[in-house]
Structures are given as C-alpha cells and as structure tokens.
C-alpha cells in the first residue's frame, strides 16, 4: 500500500510539473506573438552639457565596445527619437518635435532669439536649468567639456517673466521633494520667482517654485529649476533595484510625465498638483 501511495504521489507530482511547463510555454508564446508597437517615436531634440550622449572618458572610451550612454538617456530613447542639436541657426525642427534643454551651453543672443521665436510660433520646450549643478566630472572647472555649473539662460527667463534663484535657506543640499504624485531626490535645487513685466509670457509657478509652466505666444515652455535629478546617484537606488527591480525615486517618471504633458499641450495639473 505504501508503495502504491508513493507511486500515486509521484504521478500527481509529474502531472503538476507538466501542467506548469505547459503554462510557461503558453506564456512564452503569448509574449512572442503580441503585436509590436510600430508607431514612430516622437522626435525630441536635445541640447545639453551633461554627459548623456557620451561618456567623459574621451573618444577612446566612447569607441570602446562596452561604451554606453547615460541611463537617463537610455530611458528616454525608449520612448523618443532623440536627436542632438548642435547649431540652432541651422536647426530645422521636425513636425511636432519637442525640444529638451538640459543644462545647455551658453547661447549667443541670436540663438536666444531663435528659441523664443520658435516657441512663440508653437514650439514646445522643456528646460532643466540648474543654478548650482553638482554633477561629478573628470574635468576641472573652466574646461569646456565639463557640465555647465550654473544656467546661462537668465536673459531668456527674464524676457518670459521669471527668474532662477538658489534658495539660501536650504541647510541640507540633498533633499527629497514631492511634486504631486512624484517623490524625487536631488541636490541644490533652484526656485523660480516672478520677475518684472511678464507680458511677454504667462508663467504659472508650481511645486513651491521648482516648476514654471509658461504660455509663450502659440507655444509653451516648461521650466524645472534643477538638472542634477537626472544623475543616477539620486534616483536609481541599486539596493532597491536588486530587491524590487524599480527605481528608488521617481525622477525619471517625472521627466517623462513633463514631456508627455508638454507633448499633449496640457497644463501641469493632475499628477503635478499636490493632493
């Protein structure tokens, strides 16, 4: 009897294993036969001094087999067709193209005019402007290859009716900030303040000064007073990633949500408003 019971138990165990294997094969077949999204990615122009496209190790490192772009760039490129913009004078925007200025280089006056005119004619731009960037770099201060320490777009911001400042009362530079449903971590974030006559742009200042949503002519500019939040040190959370497979902070989710709101030409409400 005991022998028959053991044989019966093994039989049911074998049946259970076969059923589990069939279930896994069905899942694999479903995953491989799901329709692939063939829609083209929205175009996104990018101007930045941050090491997002390439590493800081020089051309040898960039050409190495294991060279890889920054994780923030990899995340964005999964959803956008990212194109570097080197020369604003010769730049020809594609239809419905967004523009991301992430702590960009200093622009000549004629380039600032080009940005302003493009936005007024219906352009959509997200600007990450940091008053005191802490992003680590291999290059010394003053080296053109180093990310820009402070935003140089003050003339454009003033024309649109806002001013970027660094709050002096922050005793702890690294801070957790809540923007609506997004919990982010960054360092030395700035603040937007209204400045002078804002007739050239209508800007709503949100999230305790961290965001400004500006209607400029027929277009729109969303301004975030920080760029360090793109650094993986502030959002990836390797220990948390090992345990959950998710980011520790929602920095990249915020970036994607801002671009999506800009693309849909919707105001920053809903998820961006503190409940």
Which positions does each model-derived feature cover?
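Short, surface-exposed patches at the edges or C-terminal ends of soluble domains, predominantly
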Residues: 2-275
